[in-house]
């Protein structure tokens, strides 16, 4: 970020293990509405700081890198997790080499932080020429958050909860440190080597920079933000659940205000990247994640799960259906109890009924597979009809093979199509057949044992 007065970048502290999460996954990768927590921090910072963002990683570093391997992110490794102050020291060479005037330092476990909160900190600190600024909150229960100590209204220090001593520091305040700082690079550089680990945790605290700055006569700003819950960190499963619920409610409310009809809104989960056009209808409970698009007048019934899929205007996904990397065109209907796996496509007015599974398969315009069917690696022509119990046998144990069915073809119930195989236009396959050879246009194919009726005897 740059203005007429200063330039700024950001350091995200994301090296912690998150012991209180009781998970093998790094804390910053804990999911919120299908996305890792850290992605929400990036979402808030990217518009403000462009590419001048460094992420300090440590515990599970390879997992974090892998989670963001398709994004242009710059990581700094903290080999030993010796505290937040040490994490900042690890990134400081990058900060100074960039030539920026101010650096924002923020924990990677603040997924609900909003750009406007960051802008407020920038304005109050860099905008006024202060050397150190940080966001504070006032809570009824300060819990385990660092306490802000003031002298005559001015910030004097930030003391971690476990180190707070009323005999030494005075009555315990309700003002806490939100863990979001703005530091003037030139002013803070001499302070970093002065950090010590003489505390209950034996770690180097970034909070000590505040007290050091006060002692050096630097200007320190505590930017008060009331009791804004969006600025609280996430350390436990309960706090993760709280943050996810706040995020879920905000996203659903935004879609309601944009003209989306959401029924049983309290049971609907919508990811941050999901796009829903006005007039679409969503029935809860259901879950929509990833880069999903739902067009105007599309309907998603209750108990559906959708990820990275496109539901075009006027399409329908009926109850208890599952769609991932799939596409449903205008007028097409899938479900109830349908499973659309990656590569499943329903073209205009196609029908996919109950207990039908599709993967890398296309139902062309007006084609129908109404029930109890598996279609894999298949192209089903327009207005073709797939009878109940039909299976495309696409896997030979080594390779996958395709099945092609022509327009207006009719596949009888309980048919096995052994790929690679092609069924011609307007061809008819008798029920119960096992088809291993191509069927030409207009032909009738029957491949089943001949029925034989025997007279029933006394002992039969």
UniProtKB/Swiss-Prot annotation:
Binding-site positions, acetyl-CoA: 388, 394-395, 413, 431, 448
Active site (UniProt): 371 (proton acceptor)
Cofactor: Mg(2+)
Domain of life: Bacteria
UniProt catalytic activity: alpha-D-glucosamine 1-phosphate + acetyl-CoA = N-acetyl-alpha-D-glucosamine 1-phosphate + CoA + H(+); N-acetyl-alpha-D-glucosamine 1-phosphate + UTP + H(+) = UDP-N-acetyl-alpha-D-glucosamine + diphosphate
The EC number(s) this enzyme carries: 2.7.7.23, 2.3.1.157
Region (Linker): 238-258
Gene Ontology biological process terms in this record: cell morphogenesis; cell wall organization; lipid A biosynthetic process; peptidoglycan biosynthetic process; regulation of cell shape; UDP-N-acetylglucosamine biosynthetic process
Keyword Transcription: no
Protein localization: Cytoplasm
Record keywords, A-Z: Acyltransferase, Cell shape, Cell wall biogenesis/degradation, Cytoplasm, Magnesium, Metal-binding, Multifunctional enzyme, Nucleotidyltransferase, Peptidoglycan synthesis, Repeat, Transferase
Assembly, per entry: Homotrimer.
NCBIfam families: glmU, PRK14356.1
Its biological purpose: Catalyzes the last two sequential reactions in the de novo biosynthetic pathway for UDP-N-acetylglucosamine (UDP-GlcNAc). The C-terminal domain catalyzes the transfer of acetyl group from acetyl coenzyme A to glucosamine-1-phosphate (GlcN-1-P) to produce N-acetylglucosamine-1-phosphate (GlcNAc-1-P), which is converted into UDP-GlcNAc by the transfer of uridine 5-monophosphate (from uridine 5-triphosphate), a reaction catalyzed by the N-terminal domain.
Protein name: Bifunctional protein GlmU
Organism lineage: Bacteria, Pseudomonadati, Thermodesulfobacteriota, Desulfovibrionia, Desulfovibrionales
Gene: glmU
């Amino acid at each position: 970020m740059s203005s007429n007065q200063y330039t700024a970048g950001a350091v995200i502290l994301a090296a912690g293990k998150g012991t209180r999460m009781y998970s093998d996954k790094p804390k910053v990768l804990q999911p919120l509405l299908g996305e890792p927590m850290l992605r929400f921090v990036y979402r808030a910072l990217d518009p403000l700081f462009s590419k001048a963002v460094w992420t300090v990683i440590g515990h599970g570093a390879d997992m974090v890198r892998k989670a963001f391997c398709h994004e242009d992110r710059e990581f700094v490794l903290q080999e030993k997790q010796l505290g937040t102050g040490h994490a900042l020291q690890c990134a400081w060479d990058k900060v100074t080499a960039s030539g920026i005037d101010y650096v924002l330092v923020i924990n990677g476990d603040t997924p609900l932080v909003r750009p406007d909160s960051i802008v407020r900190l920038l304005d109050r600190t860099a905008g006024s020429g202060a050397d150190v600024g940080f966001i504070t909150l006032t809570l009824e229960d300060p819990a385990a958050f660092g306490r802000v100590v003031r002298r005559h209204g001015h910030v004097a220090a930030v003391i971690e909860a476990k180190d707070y001593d009323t005999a030494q520091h005075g009555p315990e305040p309700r003002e806490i440190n939100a863990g979001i700082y703005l530091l003037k690079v030139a002013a803070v550089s001499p302070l970093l080597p002065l950090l010590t680990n003489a505390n209950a945790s034996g770690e180097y605290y970034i909070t000590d920079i505040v007290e050091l700055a006060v002692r050096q006569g630097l200007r320190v700003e505590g930017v008060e933000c009331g009791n804004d819950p969006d600025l609280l960190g996430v350390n436990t499963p309960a706090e993760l659940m709280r943050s996810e619920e706040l995020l879920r409610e905000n996203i659903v409310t935004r879609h309601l205000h944009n003209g989306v009809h959401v029924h049983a809104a309290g049971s609907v989960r919508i990811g941050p990247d999901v796009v829903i056009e006005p007039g679409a209808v969503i029935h809860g409970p259901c879950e929509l994640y990833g880069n999903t698009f739902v067009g105007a007048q599309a309907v998603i019934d209750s108990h559906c799960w959708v990820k990275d899929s496109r539901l075009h205007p006027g399409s329908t996904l009926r109850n208890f259906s599952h769609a991932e990397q799939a596409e449903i065109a205008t007028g097409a209907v899938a479900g109830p109890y349908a499973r659309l796996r990656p590569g499943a496509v329903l073209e205009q007015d196609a029908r996919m009924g109950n207990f039908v599974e599709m993967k890398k398969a296309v139902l062309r315009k007006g084609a129908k597979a109404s029930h109890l069917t598996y279609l894999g690696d298949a192209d089903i022509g327009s207005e073709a009809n797939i009878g109940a119990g039909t299976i495309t046998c696409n896997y030979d144990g080594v390779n996958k093979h395709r099945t092609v069915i022509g327009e207006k073809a009719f596949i009888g119930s309980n048919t096995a199509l052994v790929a690679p195989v092609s069924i011609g236009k307007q061809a008819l396959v008798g029920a119960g057949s096992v088809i291993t050879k191509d069927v030409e246009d207009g032909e009738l194919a029957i491949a089943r044992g001949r029925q034989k009726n025997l007279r029933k005897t006394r002992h039969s």
